[in-house]
Amino acid sequence: MDAVMTDPCDQQRCRVLGVGVDACRDVMASAIGLHARGGGQIVTLNAEMTMSALADASLGEAIAAAELVIPDGAGVVWALSRQGVRVRRSPGIELAHGLLRYAEHHGWKVALIGAAPEVMERLQQRLAMEMPDLRLVLSAHGYQAPEAWPALEATLKAEAPDLVLLALGVPRQETWALRVRQGQPGLWMGVGGSFDVWAGVKQRAPQWMSRFQVEWLYRLVQEPSRWRRMLSLPAFAWAVLRRG
């Protein structure tokens, strides 16, 4: 049995623009407690995803069905503060890495799915060095041929991992997890570009940018093609302000 548990009272479901998000005392404890209760889906909510959920019913459904939705973005934390809910920002990449460490120490079975083939190859090499006792039962890049996905899903169900990390991008990683995880144990979590960072292909924003809540600017410099997606940030702020 897991040594770390969390009381359900430590987790309160709030709403930002109608999209559910949980205020937790400790997101790591909440995640481990969720695993101990049979597992479920973890979503890392930021302003961009919130706006996408309002426009994409399938994404909204996946977020609503998730057992744990953590406030990944500064915008979500700010929106909650306007409701009198004080929470700390909980970057999904940090929770996911912490869960990998926990998995290594507690013998959890882990599956990693997503990112480009070369990224997955480098990630496997790095994890073998950094977490030699990690039980990696399945790893697959995210550019599989359409006909390969049913077999991949079957393997996932047969292995029944304790932790499934998906780097398939929003909304695919959330909607895919909702569909495939039905009847399955373990934690299922979308991690966006985390595999690229862990593989050393990309870098996280410097800590000072995180403190000043301008990580979005660092990501935009790394990926100029994101500029259209960034337009959701002022739209999110305006929508929150309009709600009062």
Language-model segment annotations:
Residues 77-155, 159:
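Conserved beta-alpha
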Residues 57-66, 174-194:
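A short, gly/pro- and small-residue-rich
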Residues 77-80, 204-244:
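A transmembrane-helix-recognition feature enriched in membrane-embedded lipid enzymes
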Residues 1-94:
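N-terminal nucleotide/polyanion-binding subdomain common to many enzyme families
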Residues 76-78, 172-173, 194-199:
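Short gly/pro/ser/thr-enriched loop/turn and capping motifs at secondary-structure boundaries
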Residues 141-147, 186-222:
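Short, flexible loop segments at boundaries between secondary-structure elements
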Residues 39, 108, 184-186:
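A short helix->loop->beta-strand "cap" motif at the edges of active sites that frequently abuts
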Residues 156, 160-170:
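Proline-aspartate-enriched helix->loop->beta-strand connector
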